Amino acid sequence: MSINVYEMVTNRIIEQLENNIVPWEKPWQGTIDGAFNRVSKKPCSILNQMLLKYDGEYASFKQWKDLGGHIRKGEHSEIIVFWKMYPIKENQDDGTEIIKTIPLLKYINVFHISQVDGVEPLKQKVTHDIEPIDKAEKILNDYWNRENITIEHVKGDKAFYSPMFDKIQLPLFEQFKSSEEYYSTATHESIHSTMKVTRCNRQEDRKGKVVSFGSEEYSKEELVAEIGSAQLMNIVGIETTKSFRNSTAYIQSWLKVLRNDNKFIVSASSKAEKAVNYILGNQ
């Protein structure tokens, strides 16, 4: 029986949401590394960060063995996913044959450093060269100025991005309970702003579809914005704050989307990662 990797991933996210755990809102641990591969030192993708239980070092059974470690008896693995390119033959109209490559989602089992004997953990980077709030302010201001996005602060309770006017409206800074809450909201709306055709072009996905609160398309874009915002907050070192966007109503709307489309969490995390890189200027 073949294993549906999309189903495995989606079921893991659904399980967390059903237990009121929002997987992209990891508790702040004082390190911006998140989960990463012990051998390559590369951070895990946004999707894999959501799938894994812990921050810190992960590696496959073989990688830990090559490092001189061994997995303790009774320990259970977790999964991470990756794309693998496969060649396929395709016949052309003129009878010729070409080789194309298609991406397939695969998974491997990994273990956390806490499950391993014989390998010392690496030292974690805990300090920040720049204050998190200052870093968040610089990243957003650089992005807004680079893209000529209009920013309006209006006394009230509405925060939104207007694609028509390429404008982000936010409540006044002093209306927020904390600086962290302000920047959480500002990054959320900034992720929305990357939907523009000349940026990450998620507007193309919405053509001819109903986009209103509670609709599937609305929930999909909200999921992209939430995942992307949480990732940006983690990058600058600000604890992701609980918000109305993680209320029961929102969680239920996300569950509905994920149950209807077992490929969407993979797509949403990929779109969020693309949006984050665009804002950071890494595209």
Predicted regions and their residues:
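N-terminal accessory/interface modules of nucleic-acid-binding and processing proteins
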Residues: 1-283
